[in-house]
Structures are given as C-alpha cells and as structure tokens.
Amino acid sequence: MFSLQEICRKNIYFLPDWLSEHVIQRLGLYWEKHGSLQRIGDDYVLIQQDLIIPINEALRMAGEEGSDEVVQLLLLWEGNIHYAIIGALEGDHYSLIRKLYDQIEDCHDILPLIQDPKIFEKCHELDKSCNILCLVLHAVKNDMPCILQDYKTHLSGEDIQVVFETACRSQKYDIVRWMGQNIAIYNPEVIFNIAFDKINTTLLSIGYTLLFNHRINNMNENIDSLLTQHLEWAAGMGLLHFMLETLKYGGDVTIAVLSEAVKYDHRKVLDYFLRRKNLYQEDLEELLLLAIRADCSKKTLNLLLSYLNYSINNIRKKILQCVKEYETTIIIKILWKRKINLIGPILADFIGYHSYTYMVDFMREFSIHPEKMIKMAARESREDLIIKFSKNVCKEPKDRLHYLKSLVYTMRHKEGKQLLIYTIHNLYKACHLESKEMFNLARFYARHNAVIQFKSICQDLSKLNINIKNLLLECLRIAIKKNYPQLIRTIKTDMSYE
C-alpha cells in the first residue's frame, strides 16, 4: 500500500511558494545540488522553479548521480526505468544498477536508447546468458559499427554470415558496405536475396557495387548467370526499377526474362522492353501463347497482339489448343472484336465436355444463336444439352418438338441428325399428339429415313385403331423416291398387316 506521503508525492503538480526548503525535503520533493522538484504534466519536471526538462532526462541524470531517492520519485511519476539504468551505468553505480535491473525483464530493450558504445556494452553485459555474437547483432541493429569492428576477430565464419544477413535485413547500409569491403563473407549473395525479399533497390545497388568494385569472394565466377537470374526474378515480380538497376551492370533482357513478366502478368515491364527491343515474330508469338496459358489480363494480351499487328495465322491452331487446354476465352473474345473468329473451331471442343451453365454463359458472351448450340451438341452426342437448350427456346413440349424438327432439315452431320431425331421421338413419347400431328411426324420420319422411329409411331397409331393404310402408301412413295431400301421393306411389311 502507498503511504499518504507517497500518494501526495505522486499526484502533486503544484508547490506553494510558501513551502520552505525543509518541508520540501521532508516531502521527498528535493534533489540534492539541484533544488525542488515539481511534476509538470505527464512528461516533464520543473527543477527549482526554473528549469523544465523531460522526466526521462531527469531520470538519466539522477541515475548517473546515484540518487536512489530521486530515481524512485521520478519512477513514481511514471518515468521510464530504462533511462535510470542508463544513467546508473554512466555513473558506475552498480548497487543502483542491480536494484533497478531486477525490475525489468530484458536488457536488450534498453539498447536502442543508448548512443555511447561503451555504455552499450556495459548494458549488454547485464545479461549473463548472452555471448559476443548477441552483442554484435544488437550493435548492428542499433548502428554501433565500432563494436563490430572491435569484435570481428572473435566471430566465426558462420557468425559473420549471420551478422551480415542481419545488417542487410536491418538496412544498415554503411555496415553492409564495410563488411563487404573488409570481412570475408561465406555467402555474400544473400544480399541480393534480401534485396528482392525487401524490394530494396539500395541494397541491390550496394550488392552490385561490392560485386564489381570489390570482387567479394565467390561472386565473380558466374556473373552473367547471376545477372540473368536477377533479371528473371525482377521481371516475375514486376520490379522494373530492379531490372533497370541490374542492367547498369550487365545482363540482357532475353525471351526467358520477358517470359517471367508474362507468366505473372506484369504488363508495364513488358511494355517498357517491347518498345525498346525488336523481337522476332516467332518470339512474340511464343510470348502470346504463354500469356494465354497464364490467363493474363486483356491489357497484356492486347499489348502482345498489337506488336503482332493482330496477325495470328501462324499460331491459330496453337491458340485453339491453349484455349481448349486451359479453358480460357479472353483471347477468343479479343480476336472476335477484331473480326477474327475462332468461336466455331473452339465451340465443338467446349460443348463436348462443358456443362450447360458454362455453355449458356459462353453463348451469351459471344452472341451465339441457340440453333447453333443445339446442332453442335448433336454433333458431339450431347443429348442433355439438346434438351436443355431447346427447353430454353420453347417452353411447351409440342413447340419444342416442331422446333427440333425444323433443325433436322438443315442438319448435315449424319450422326447429329440421328441424335436429333432420337431426341424428337423421346419428346413425342412424353407428350400427347393428335392423330393429325402423329401423321405429320410419321411423314417426317419417312423423309429422313428414321426407320425405327417410323415403325414405332405406326405401332402407336395402330394401337389407337387408326387406319394408316393411306399414310403407309404416302410414305412408301417417299421411301421409293429417296431410295430408302430398309424403310421400303418396313412399310411393305406393315402394309401386309393392314
């Protein structure tokens, strides 16, 4: 529990002028050799009614003087204990240091507040479990290169590697330069990995400077392949400024490099280099095919097509193959708007294995008439699509039957026509037709040599006790005229029973 005096000391913000120095001392609001102490707001103190300083600066001063009583007062006023420890370290007051250090968890939290390398080391020594590598790593993070210089001979090659990576990740550029110039580093290429990871052009530039000006070990054996790798990485990440920085030191933007930009749809990188390079037609075509496979945006596809002047004659089949394999229609739509129609060739492939929902969207996107969709479905033996598309056109079964009959007349594909007739007959079975309509359907079957369906509807008519002799005669004339031998035999057989 706080005493009444402590509560007063913590919360008093105003000292009356009439209080004597003796009373102020008894209240514990007096700093030896400085005078009275008064709290000003949350962050400042007033000394001897004259000097205002930050509370943490006052804590550092009190710690340096070893004034435990003033330190406790300022901590009561919510000062930062780290500054008291720094001051105590500066004044070598170890009893106060031990007392204060027991109240904190980690000396490493204090290190960023210290600017003096000697105090930095003394503070780090408070943690008995830490080693030299730990000291150097924190020195690097807190811009204390002199500590690294002092202890570099105490570090193993593995330790040096860790310190170098830490300097790179912490973006301590001066330390990175100094290490690259003065210390043997096992894997210096890590600077480039970190530069790409952090997207840090400065670090990339430092790496190249060390590589070319100081020839840091093991990095000058495969410079060309290293630069090419960096260009590919940068292109794949869309980092044009990285590519331009790399090109200052060598390398070339090859098709392999541009392919990385295409794969990840970085149009700005492509645009920049396509404007400046005269690529062969074949190279542009390969980039376009890659863009289709990568499902790139319309803008990227249009960019590549523009450099081809929208001429795709050489790769038409390859485009269709990519569209089919990767199920992308963006390129088809772009070319369609340019009056280059690839819809027909791809429609058969798509309708062969895609769902009705997908094909409806495809039909709407490219304004394809349902008649074409149904005929193509018939060619590809997709009765399910025939039924669904025809339902979409005609809601009533009889209307649908007449609609499908009209398509048979213009259907040239033999197997497709047979499937349409088969679908029509199934539809006929599912709906009730008048005898006149059944006669018309029988004549339709005769005209198209649909023997099985003709025989079936004739049997249905006979079951209804309807005289079909005249119908058979009429259909026989049709069969003879069109030279349908099997249908002729079927009709003659039926006539023998009439």
Curated annotation (Swiss-Prot):
Disulfide bridge partners, by residue number: none
Q: What induces it?
A: Expressed in the early phase of the viral replicative cycle.
Listed InterPro entries? MGF_505 (IPR004858)
Q: Does the entry feature the keyword Disulfide bond, yes or no?
A: no
To which protein family does this belong?
Belongs to the asfivirus MGF 505 family.
Q: Does the keyword NADP apply?
A: no
Short name of any one Pfam family annotated for the protein: DUF249
> Keywords for this entry?
Early protein
Which function does this protein serve?
A: Plays a role in virus cell tropism, and may be required for efficient virus replication in macrophages.
**Under what name is this protein listed?**
Protein MGF 505-5R
